[in-house]
Regions:
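Cytosolic regulatory regions of ion transport systems
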Residues: 1-81
Length: 81
């Protein structure tokens, strides 16, 4: 399966890595470079961008994904957008 995980904090990072270890294709998205650095070797692709920015979201291959997971916990409003 193809997953897109938006938000690579504690929860999103563990989820994305575990999905990848299970043989899934996982793309990770986060706006913090330290979160990107922590997973870039374990995920298929990573994007450093702000998921609250609609123009940035247009850069993501959303139509190619089977499942999109929003794992944004610090800004609840961003996770609802």
């Amino acid at each position: 399966m193809k997953y897109l995980v938006i938000g690579l904090g504690t929860y999103g990072r563990e989820l994305a890595i575990n999905l990848s270890l299970q043989g899934n294709e996982v793309i990770g998205v986060d706006h913090r470079s330290e979160n990107i650095e922590a997973v870039k070797e374990q995920l298929m692709t990573v994007y450093e961008l702000d998921a609250k920015d609609e123009n940035s979201l247009k850069l993501l291959p959303l139509k190619n994904m089977d499942i999109v997971i929003v794992a944004i916990g610090e800004d609840f409003g961003a996770s609802l957008k």
